[in-house]
Amino acid sequence: MMGSRRSRRVSWASGGNLCKVRLFLSEDSPSQAGLRPQDNLQAKGSWLLHAAGPSSDDSLPPGFESLPPSNDLKIDMSQIPLIRWKCPPHIVLEQDWHIVAGEESREIEIQNERINGALEAIYPRPSNIPPNPFLSLDVKDAHYDDSKTLLVPLIPLEDDDASDQLEGPTLDLPSHYNITGVSNTPVSAEQQPPCGGAISSGFTIEPQAAVSATVTAIMQTIQSNQNGSMADQNGSTIDQELLFKILSDPSQLQRLMKECGPVRHEQSASSSVVAPLVSIPPPQITASSPAPFSDHVGTFHGMNPTLPPPPPMMNRPPSTIPSVAMNHPPSSSPAMNFGSALPSSSPSVNFGSVPGRGVGYYKTLIHQHGGERLEQPFEQHGMQFGMYRQPGPPQNGGIDAMNGAAAMVSRDGKVRPMKPCAYFNSPKGCRNGASCTFLHDASAPTRKDHQKQKGSKRIKLDNTMGGRN
């Protein structure tokens, strides 16, 4: 097979006859033929050069012979008409065409108002010119009061009522009210003094004296506030600064004890803890103090207003602070005293040199009695939701559940509407919780139960109708 193949060889002409030939149509552009304009001209020039040489036609293939030269390609430049160049005329603007400064425009009025509104000052010499003429020197000395700045409320209207109910209501007492205090330590029958005996002058009763003076000062301050001293803004709140000054001044404390009158007691056969009653013509006060000492607990039946006040004692820490609860029981119900029954005779108690309390004790006492106690959400809304607390054993001295309920009702300043909450028992739930202004009734049927009832009725009707058919 190798011998049957024919070998192909390329032979070149001699060096003198070797030339480069490019073939393309005259209608085709150099870009379409794959040539640039310079290559096109060079190809044409080389082709004409070889065509003009001797024996050029013999070396060219048939059809590529050179054309006879013609003189028609010569152009006479003198026969071509020429146009003389003329410079264009210069643009000359007339005087009437000049644009004015804008007297008829609207911006000129705004600019004139801006110029007239700017303050002008004339300075006789350059040294009198301030660094910044637009900034007054009085601005540095001026002090702005931030209290005059109005506060923009950020709480929505629907959340405002809930926030008001969470806060403790202001202390608003009518003409007849009772202040009942219950001691944290129950008094047994063995620790009570004899019925007919009198307490000696050397026996000191520090908690009772401090509580009596404090309750008396509180009542005096409340009466002064109700008479109009603070009726403009906080007519029902207690001025703690004034109360602190009264308790710190022995002369003022003695004067208040004289004005309020003696202390008397009322007893009840069904009570378990003794609570002395401080009487004032308009109100009734029932107060007692805890027993901070385990060896003796004394009860007092009267008070001698002629004795001097106890001197202040700074080196002794304050004892336990009694609590005072505000309630409004009916006027026909008697004062409830907790403790064993005592005879009606009330022997007088003569106070000797009773050591006083320190400044820290009075501050703590004012803070304890002057502040408003916040009710728990269950205590605030338990009466309305129908959730009544069962009476249990007394803790920390004990207090009657009825008195607690009365205090809870008296502290509830706003009456809740009986309209049920639309979000309660729903999949999303009420976001206000116990502070919601609407009624949360757990016994009401939910939306799912209502839908189930409707669905069951429809199924029952469909079954009956299918059976008939």
Curated annotation (Swiss-Prot):
Keyword annotations for this protein, in alphabetical order, are: DNA-binding, Metal-binding, Zinc, Zinc-finger
Q: Return the annotated region ranges for Disordered.
A: 444-469
Q: Where are the zinc fingers (C3H1-type)?
A: 415-443
| Transmembrane segments annotated in the record for this chain | none
Q: What GO molecular function annotation could you give as one example from this UniProt entry?
A: zinc ion binding
Q: Which InterPro entries match?
A: Znf_CCCH, Znf_CCCH_sf
Q: Where is the composition biased (Basic residues)?
A: 449-458
Q: Does the keyword DNA-binding apply?
A: yes
**Which PROSITE patterns does this UniProt record tie to the protein?**
ZF_C3H1 (PS50103)
Tell me the domain of life: Eukaryota
Record protein name field: Zinc finger CCCH domain-containing protein 30
